[in-house]
Structures are given as C-alpha cells and as structure tokens.
Amino acid sequence: MLIAQRPTLTEEPISEFRSKFILEPLEPGFGYTIGNSLRRTLLSSIPGAAVTSIRIEGVEHEFTTVPGVKEDVTEIILNLKGLVVSSEHDEPVLMYLRKQGPGVVTAADIAPPAGVEVHNPEMHIATLNSKGKLEMEMTVERGRGYVSAAQNKQPGQEIGRIPIDSIYSPVMRVTYKVEATRVEQRTDFDRLILDVWTKPAIRPRDAVASAGKTLVELFGLARELNVDAEGIDMGPSPTDAALAADLALPIEDLNLTVRSYNCLKREGIHTVGELVARTEQDLLDIRNFGAKSIEEVKQKLSDMGLALKDAQGGFDPGSAAGSYGSDHDQSYVETEQY
C-alpha cells in the first residue's frame, strides 16, 4: 500500500463572505481533479432558499403596473431575484410585504416568519409616490441550483400567482488554480488554491464543507464495490509530538551507509515514517538491499525506539504517514560493497 504525505487544508479569509482555501501537498494531477470537482459541486449542489412565486394585490400577471408604484411588475420581479434568504423549513413558507407611500420599499419591509431570515435588508424593491401602496405575498422554498419560472409554475395555479426564476445557490463565484509545490527534492506536487465567494446566507467555509461532504458520499459508493481495494493511504496524523517529529525526519538523518541510503531513495523512501511503514521483506525485495543493510536499518530504528512494520512493536502504515520536511539534497556515489 502506498503511503502519501497527509495534505493540509488552510483557510485565508479575505472578507466575511470570501475566502481562499489552500490544499497541499497533493500527488501530481490531483490538484485539477479535486479543484474541478469542488468548484462544480459548490456552484450546483449547495442547498439554499429562494422566492419561487409572488402575488401582488390588484395584479393578475407580470406584464402590468401597480398604481402609485414607479417600477412595473417586471422590474419588481427582477429586483426580487436578488433577495438573499435562508429557510429552516423543508416545506414552502410565505413572507409578506405591506408598504404605504410615499417612500422606498426595501427588503427590510418584508415580514418573514419564524425560521426564515432576510440577509440583505437594504436591497431595493420599489419606489412609491404619495398615493402608492404595495401589498405582496412571497413564497419561499428550499432547493439547489437554478430553477426557471416555467418550472416553478404549478398545475392549477391560482390567478394572480406569478412564478419567478429561483437562484437557490448561496455560492456566487468559485475559481481555482493549481501551482507546483516542493516536497523535499521533488517539485512536481500540486498546491490547490480555491477562491470562494458566497452570499450572506452562508460562510465560505461552510459551503466548502458541504461540498466536501457531498463528494465523500458520492465517492463512497465506488469504494463500497470493494472495501478491501488498495489505494493511496493518507494515514492519520500522529498525535504525539515527539513521535511525529521522529517520523518526519528525512532518512539522511539516520546516517546510513551509502548503499543503504541510495537503495531507499531509489525506492521512494524519503522519511523515517515511510521506512517504518515497510516490512523486512519489503526492504529485502529492493535491489542491492541485503541482510547487512536490513540489520543496519533495524539498529538505527531501534536507537530511536522504532521498528519495521512486521517487528515486535512495529508500526502499521496507517499510523506512520510519511512527511517530507527537509531540503537535504545529497548525491552519494556507491562505493561500499557487501
């Protein structure tokens, strides 16, 4: 089983509703795989709430005007598409707006029921003159993505009920880029930078967490085909600080002989953590790695209180995740013979 360094995810808040998320280091190619999957999921699959239909007192359809109101019904509907709401209810709920002119009608004039919140109360809806009056009923529903007014139209819908386009997604924009990052001597690992903008209804970190949960659930279906299938094991991070430091040491610090060092490096073993994840037979299978090299490695590990995986008190790969943490770049020439 291959052991990879456990990636870390950090958040860099830019504003209340914009954050950058940095995931590194990733195996080459995984930056684009994960970045594209997260972006598409964030934009299409995060649940939210939106107005799906309205009813205005004295209005039968959207192609008309309301006496005393500057904006026609089409303009009012266009403004309502920018309303940011959240709802705790799975079923549709009603909100009401009643305003007498003169004055400006904003989202702050809406009276939402318990469990529903308007997040942009400053949003402009309409302008009333001294004789103007606006009474409106809005239906709020939960959903995902975008639903057109035609899809929101219900069979047998009452006269005066006007369906509108609904933008449920609380995520406004997502971009990502992949940079190269260095892990010891290798410079081809991926660094994923995800930039997320959200509406006031949700924080970027909560949106990313929701997208991650959705993807885990979906990819879990593939894993269930064979729970014993081999893959890259990220391994849990050791909790003991001293042990974590020992496992992160580059094998250069073991002061091995030239032959042993070069054999391990060619096999892709760069840290003590990766070394203790191998069995004695794994090492014997390495070309030019003989019994004397095995004894040398076992002695060096014993001096640190560690052992190979199959030894008494040895380590399981799941708990010995390698961590590359050195810039050592030694090029040895094999001259010693066994």
UniProtKB/Swiss-Prot annotation:
One of its GO terms (biological process) is DNA-templated transcription. Keywords: DNA-directed RNA polymerase, Nucleotidyltransferase, Transcription, Transferase. Its EC number is 2.7.7.6. GO terms for molecular function: DNA binding; DNA-directed RNA polymerase activity; protein dimerization activity. Residues 317-338 are annotated as: Disordered. Residues 241-338 are annotated as: Alpha C-terminal domain (alpha-CTD). Disulfide bonds: none annotated. GO terms for cellular component: cytoplasm; DNA-directed RNA polymerase complex. Pfam families: RNA_pol_A_bac, RNA_pol_A_CTD, RNA_pol_L. It comes from the Bacteria. Residues 1-226 are annotated as: Alpha N-terminal domain (alpha-NTD). It catalyses: RNA(n) + a ribonucleoside 5'-triphosphate = RNA(n+1) + diphosphate. Homodimer. The RNAP catalytic core consists of 2 alpha, 1 beta, 1 beta' and 1 omega subunit. When a sigma factor is associated with the core the holoenzyme is formed, which can initiate transcription. Belongs to the RNA polymerase alpha chain family. NCBIfam families: PRK05182.1-2, PRK05182.1-4, PRK05182.2-5, rpoA. The N-terminal domain is essential for RNAP assembly and basal transcription, whereas the C-terminal domain is involved in interaction with transcriptional regulators and with upstream promoter elements. DNA-dependent RNA polymerase catalyzes the transcription of DNA into RNA using the four ribonucleoside triphosphates as substrates. This is DNA-directed RNA polymerase subunit alpha. It comes from Thermobifida fusca (strain YX). The gene is rpoA.
